[in-house]
């Protein structure tokens, strides 16, 4: 049974709609629905993950782990869990609403984008992940899709979401479960070896690589061949895409995408690298090259995974401008439905923590030479 999680117990409510005004369905997960809602007391907009308790049977451990992790976290660059309610046969996780859209979308929309912009983004990610690591938490699924902008403001901060695969390290225990997203997972995970916080640092290196060229360091249609590349840590800084990128940026990436986890930079070491802490990140506009590669390698496939993130951002703009009229165009459900793909995660507006998906397990097809 759910309940044996760290942190305060959740609150009881006879009817959650007495507390929150349910607006729109933002997305549907494996056993949850995500609702854009307004707190009737404060008029604050939130994202509510609505979970049928009967659907959690056999999955209680995963849910308890996620809640326990979220209860421990309070960082300006990490999506927050505000409250938990139990009402009827449902559990309601009240999450901070993140309304600025996804990382890739914002980069593509920009007209000007530089190494320095990428450096500032990675600084925020490193600072947040260092905070997690200091608490003994390993995220285990860091990737661009889990980096969301807090608001529509031009200088909005970035937020880390989706703690469905995160794990708190227990003293004396080792992490060994193969999980994560192919393409971002560290070699030691694929090699089915015990691993540590260093897996997150590898993933940050992969993200930094993509932010500077627009394509992934490892790619193959065949998972086994993809895993072979990752196991060997075989990646290149291809010409012409990397010709205008500084040597400092490449050095930074090499230290994070180091095959040996013992030699790999920690978050603390990465934060001290000149590309982050110094003045070596270049100010040359690389937007055209990077955005073209993002659109070619990521955007379309990503946007097809869920409903159009642009529609959600547009909806949020209307809400912020006060032009959204309550009751107009309502359906029998929760107002204006944004029609997510069945089973797909919510995108853009809601934090991905709200979208409980099946655990992202690696393909069982691993290369033979482990």
Curated annotation (Swiss-Prot):
Belongs to the protein kinase superfamily. CAMK Ser/Thr protein kinase family. CaMK subfamily. Widely expressed. Expressed in cells of the zona glomerulosa of the adrenal cortex. This is Calcium/calmodulin-dependent protein kinase type 1. It is found in: Cytoplasm; Nucleus. Gene3D superfamilies: Phosphorylase Kinase, domain 1 (3.30.200.20), Transferase(Phosphotransferase) domain 1 (1.10.510.10). The keyword Cell cycle applies. The modification Phosphothreonine is found at residue 177. It comes from Homo sapiens (Human). GO terms for molecular function: ATP binding; calcium/calmodulin-dependent protein kinase activity; calmodulin binding; protein serine kinase activity. ATP binds at residues 26-34, 49. A motif (Nuclear export signal) lies at residues 315-321.
């Amino acid at each position: 049974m759910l309940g044996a999680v760290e942190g305060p117990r959740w609150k009881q409510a006879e009817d959650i709609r007495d507390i929150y005004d349910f607006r729109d369905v933002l997305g549907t997960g494996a056993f949850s629905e995500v609702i854009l809602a307004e707190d009737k007391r404060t008029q604050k907009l939130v994202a509510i993950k609505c979970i049928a308790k009967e659907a959690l049977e056999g999955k209680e451990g995963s849910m308890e782990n996620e809640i326990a992790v979220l209860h421990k976290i309070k960082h300006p660059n990490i999506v927050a869990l505000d409250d938990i309610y139990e009402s009827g046969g449902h559990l309601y996780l009240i999450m901070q609403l993140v309304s600025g859209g996804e990382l890739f979308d914002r980069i593509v929309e920009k007209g000007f984008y530089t190494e320095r912009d990428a450096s500032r983004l990675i600084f925020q990610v490193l600072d947040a992940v260092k905070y997690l690591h200091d608490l003994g938490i390993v995220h285990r699924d860091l990737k661009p899709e889990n980096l969301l902008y807090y608001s529509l403001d031009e200088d909005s901060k970035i937020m880390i979401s989706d703690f469905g695969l995160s794990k708190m390290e227990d003293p004396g225990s080792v992490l060994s479960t193969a999980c994560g997203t192919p393409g971002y997972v560290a070699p030691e995970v694929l090699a089915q070896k015990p691993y540590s916080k260093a897996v997150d640092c590898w993933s940050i290196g992969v993200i930094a690589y993509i932010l500077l060229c627009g394509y992934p360091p490892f790619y193959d249609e065949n998972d086994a061949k993809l895993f072979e590349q990752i196991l060997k840590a075989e990646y290149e800084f291809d010409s012409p895409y990397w010709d205008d990128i500084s040597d400092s940026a490449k050095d930074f990436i090499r230290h994070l995408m180091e095959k040996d986890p013992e030699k790999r930079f920690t978050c603390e070491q990465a934060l001290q690298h000149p590309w982050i802490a110094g003045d070596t990140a270049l100010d040359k506009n690389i937007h055209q090259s990077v955005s073209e590669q993002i659109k070619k390698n990521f955007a379309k496939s990503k946007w097809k995974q869920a409903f159009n993130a642009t529609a959600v951002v547009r909806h949020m703009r209307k809400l912020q401008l006060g032009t959204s009229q309550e009751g107009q165009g309502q359906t029998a459900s929760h107002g204006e439905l944004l029609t997510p793909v069945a089973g797909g995660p919510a995108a853009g507006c809601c934090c991905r923590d709200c979208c409980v998906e099946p655990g992202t397990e690696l393909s069982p097809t691993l290369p033979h030479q482990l």
